Amino acid sequence: MSKDLTDLQLLTELEPVVEKNINRHLTMRKDWNPHDYIPWSDGKNYYALGGKDWDPDESKLSEVARVAMLTNLLTEDNLPSYHREIAMNFSMDGPWGFWVNRWTAEENRHGIALRDYLLVTRSIDPVELEQLRIEQVTRGFSPGQNQQLEGDADLFADSLFDSVIYVTFQELATRVSHRNTGKACNETVADQLLQRVSADENLHMIFYRDVSAAGFDMAPNQAMHSLHKVLTNFKMPGYTIPDFRRKAVTIASGGVYDPRIHLDDVVMPVLKKWRIFERDDFTGDAARLRDELAVHIEELEETCVKFDIAKQRRLERIAKVAEKKAAKDLLVGSSAS
């Protein structure tokens, strides 16, 4: 029975793959400036500079769009934790170190642009936003595959494979979330901004996906262990956001990111790209874990069906409430006239 490769061995063996994918990334990426996506002429001073404080009526975004934008921004705000995580697992030497810093620099634009847009358009309470940012960054983040707990848990990815496989799914999930949030905003500038951000996330996903693919070819059993751990315990990095569960329900009900999207647009495309259920190089315990993963996919499908039913019932309840309110308003209006 062959021994698992150490992280140092994996880093060394995968270094040419990383360098190749960095070069490809640099030819595909597009330079852009956050300020080009902000409607500055819509802005005005807040109270401290002689203007007025934020008023909820100023926001032109729907509740779903507002909650999704807030959640996306707070997720981006935790970049210091993400940088720490990948630096710890990828190292800061050679091509790996170059990628860590390059990725961080590109990711940093996202939070800058989203915050500027929300503050200039007065789409969200700036005081609440800053309070949430402080709390979110103070909490930090460690990958969800280690079942991060609320409170003082201080858990990290256990291996290079844990980290690179997790961020593959996370980057794709973030891309999908940003893209669907742009559509939910129903506002041209916001949609263009989030298209630009999601394009960055897609290129980042491709980098991690292809490095992971090389890892599967190099040490399939070892990679399979990490894949099983990642997917069966997956949590988005926004998990640490205050009141995340309530926000997640709003986002899911609004069609921005729900169980069906997670399975069909995130999980399955990556598994198909890696040919997880077609490969014949998993042996022993890894083969068993692949079978368990297939069962997990079936469970995710069941969750999707249950969610779709619950969502439809919720929409029907909302429609009935709106119908009753409209009828009541009509009756009041008729009486007044």
For the regions a language model picked out, list residue spans one by one:
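Non-heme di-metal
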Residues: 1-337
